[in-house]
Each structure stands twice: as structure tokens, then as C-alpha cells.
From Swiss-Prot:
<comment type="similarity">
    <text>Belongs to the alphaherpesvirinae HHV-1 UL21 protein family.</text>
</comment>
<dbReference type="GO" id="GO:0030430">
    <property type="term" value="C:host cell cytoplasm"/>
</dbReference>
<dbReference type="GO" id="GO:0042025">
    <property type="term" value="C:host cell nucleus"/>
</dbReference>
<keyword id="KW-1048">Host nucleus</keyword>
<dbReference type="Pfam" id="PF03252">
    <property type="entry name" value="Herpes_UL21"/>
</dbReference>
<dbReference type="GO" id="GO:0019033">
    <property type="term" value="C:viral tegument"/>
</dbReference>
<keyword id="KW-0946">Virion</keyword>
<protein>
    <recommendedName>
        <fullName>Tegument protein UL21 homolog</fullName>
    </recommendedName>
</protein>
<comment type="function">
    <text>May facilitate the viral transport through neural circuits.</text>
</comment>
<keyword id="KW-1035">Host cytoplasm</keyword>
<keyword id="KW-0920">Virion tegument</keyword>
<dbReference type="InterPro" id="IPR004936">
    <property type="entry name" value="Herpes_UL21"/>
</dbReference>
Amino acid sequence: MDIKYGHVLAYRNVQFYVSECGYKAYFFCGGCLFAVGRPRIDDEYLPELAKIGLVLRGGQSKPLAAHVRRELLRRGMKWAFSSDEDELFIDSIAVLSRDGICSERELCGLLCLETYDPDIAKYMVPTNAISGLTIQAAYDFPHDRTIHIPEFPIITDIYSDLVYECSRDAFVLTCARLTELPKSLSDLVEGLFDGIPTPREALSSEIFGRRVDVIVTAKKAANTTTVQRAWDILQHGCRGKLNVNSNRTNPVQRKKHARFSSFVQIKYIPPVFKIWSCDTSSCMPSTSLNKLWEIFWKVDSVFNMNMLNLNSNLYTENGSQSDLEIIQSELGMISNALFGRHASMFVGVGPENKNISPSQKFLLLQYIHILNRLPNCYDLIRELCDHHTSTIEGECPTAMPDCALADMTNSLFRAILFLGMATEIVVNWMPSSLEEPTSRVPSPSAFADATTLLDVAETSAPKSIQDLKIRKLALILDGLYKDIDPIDVALRESVGEDTAELLCAAIDISVLSAFEHWGYYSRYMQCIISLIDTRLRNSGCITICS
């Protein structure tokens, strides 16, 4: 979760984070964040006190909390927790690591804890940690004036700097209301607000001026609870009236009442960026190859540019990256999902052009899509390349021969077009025999894509015939994915058939150009959208049809 603050104040050698309205002050103690409210003369209730941090769990029966509580009792440090029923925060580990020779006051300003207890470590990390561990329980980002408390802390080996993955059931993020502060902390905040000015309130600022927006960046909201001190429990309803400007805390009898907390948890929803444009009315790009070559030369550098160097902070969930950087990262992941080294086999740009990068293949694919008014992100790629023109070293080399760039584009265009036409032919194909026509086995990626395409077509053929159609289409796709010419693929797959429909389709598209608008053939290119969507969905990228 995230909490914004206005400025930092050093008071009694402790760093306080003061809210913009001046009604709340925060400070760290043992890895937990304490919040103190400004006392008001015209308010009959006490200033709200809160403690936000990680609560010990270790499992369903809270074995980690039970172990720490036993160790504290064994060492005579019962003062470190309030009661057996209350939650045990992570600051108890900080007290335990110092063997009780400290007070809460000495733990102030502590965001990172240490533990050398192997029994504690086994609940946090899946492997046995013989040496000590450091637990980064909170972060302060001064440039954003944001306090960040993670759902799971970063755990590091003290000696080897090895970073462990924290067990998911070790901690629970919790926001607790306190009935009072410990004595050492109560003395610390005495007179704190005397030197903190407050802005003049408007007539309608009674509620909003004191509200604290807690931005929840985890999957679920933080737990809420109330922590009572031991003397408060014995009084059975008596509670201490804390006056942060006084040395006394007197118990007074109060009636039961309800009160709204000023800490409002707000779920953070990451922005959804529109990657794919489906606007068929947009202007067509120029058929000139000069601009395409300029982008073709830049796109590899732009997609591989490490934008995280601009902000090396681990914390990026608060939107610290610009929209352009996030879009650039997403486009890089999409191109790798389709044409990357570890991606499944897919349509190529011809056997003589195997050295072009995945980003360049992706650019040519989007160029073909926008020419045929299909969903694409060509304009985004062009804007990114134009935006980073000044950061790319060197000048654009002499343009490659137009025929080379055109040949790559046409090769990819014809492969995509033949893929769609072959799908329609196989859907309408009725095999004369249920026997396998060949012993060749298609690749797993081609078989999966053939299944996807025929599922989209929703054929009602019996399962035995459907299996033959899937195998037939998979063999065709396998040839295309290996950059075999569509005519050669059609010749091989038409052997033994009583129709030359597949071969005729391959011959027809061999004379077509990607740079001419063929309205009749555009419908065949819808098949590639289904395959792209499947690959993006499996890779966790933004899909076209989402």
C-alpha cells in the first residue's frame, strides 16, 4: 500500500512524514508505520492513532506469531506485545533480535530488520537459511513523497546478498487502530504538532481535510483490527485519553460509540493502454518505402532500449513510468511473444531473410495489417521511433534497395494470405478416405494453430473427419512456418488429392502485392488475427480482442 505525505520533519532525532493537510504525522518504528493525529480542542474524541505494517502469520494457525510470542515470554519481554489475542506485528522480530535490550523508541526510523533465528527464517523462506536475514519491510520514495509498504517484504541473506522469495503465508498486511501509544513513543510525539502549521480550512473540509487515502497496490485490501494495551483491557471499557502535548495519560470512563476511521483504502487499478487500433477510417500509410525503411532501421534499438535505466527504482506500480515507456515495454513483449527466440514457430519473411530481428518482423506484420485495415499498432511504433530519434546513435544508413524491403513485405503478406485461404479450403474439404494420407508429423505449434483456426470456423464435421482436417491444415502451416514457398507447400499437400484447389490458390497469390489494396482478399487475413490473439493471451500480453 502507498501513503502520500507533504514534507519531512526531523523532531527529537526521528524523521516524521507530515501529511499535506498537517493533521497526520507518520514515523517508522521496527519496520511498521505509526500514524499520529493532531489533537483538536473542539473534538471530544481522541486523535486517531494507527499502526500499519506486516503481521506475523506463517500459516493458518499462525505458527510464526506463536513462536515469536513464546520467545518474548521466555526472555521476559511481555511488554513487547499487548495481549495474547492481539496481532503480532513485525516489529516484535526487531525487539527479539536485540534480545530485549531496547525500547520502542530505539527502533524508530527502522525500515529494514535483521534476524538470526533459524526457526523464524524457516517460516519466511522456502530454503534453510543458516546465516542471518534482512527483511525490507517498508520503503520511502522522497522523489514521489510516497511511503510504500509491500504485501511481501524483500528478504536478503546478510552475507551472500542472495534474495529469497518470501513465503506467501508468512505475513499479512494490516492496518490497526491503537487505543494508545507505548510510553516511550507517547513521550516522543509530545508537542510534535506545535511546530506544524495547518492551512485554513474551507467550510466543507470537515471530512475531506482529514481523510488519508491509502492506495492499495496489492491484490486485496489490508486487514483491519484494534490493538488495546493491557491496562485498557483490565478497565473493561475505560480507555486512555491521549494528549500528545501532555505528560499524562488518564483513564476516563466513556460511553460506547461508533467512529469513522480517517484511513480510507483505495484500490489501485493499473491503467489499461490501448495498443491495438481498429479504426478502419484512419488514413492509410504512404506506400513509399522510404518511411518504412526509416522505422525498420530504428525499431530494433527502440524496442531493446532499457527504459528502466531512467528510473532504477524497484517501485514502478505507482505510475512512475510515463505512458510512453509502458507502451514501449508492452510492444517489446508483444514482438517477442510472436517472433522472439523462445516463441513458437510462426509465419516468416522468406528463407533469404532469416537474420532480421523479431522487432523488424513485427513491424512488417503491422505495416501489412494497416494496409489491409486490420487491427494494428503501426502508428504507435512510428510515434515511438520518432520520439526516440534523438536518443538513437548514428544516422540512418543509406536506404537498402527497395526491392529487398518490398520482397520481405510481400513474402510475409503472401504467407498470411495463403494461410487464410488454406484454412477455408480445408474447412470445406471432404476426405475420400479416413486413412492418414501421409506419415509426416506436423510440429506442435502448427498443430495447435490448426486446432485454433478450425475451432473458430466451428465446423460440424464428425470427430474422425475433424481430426483429419486438423492434421491436413497443420501440415500446411508447418510448411509456411519453415518459410517454404506457398506454391511448394500446395504441391506437396495436393499429392493424392482429387482437387487442385490449394495449388490454384497458391498460384493466385503469387502475383499479388502487399502494397495494393485487395478488398476481396482481406477477409482471408482475419485468420492471422486469431493466431496472434492466442499467442498474446498465452504470453500474458494485451490481446487484440480483449
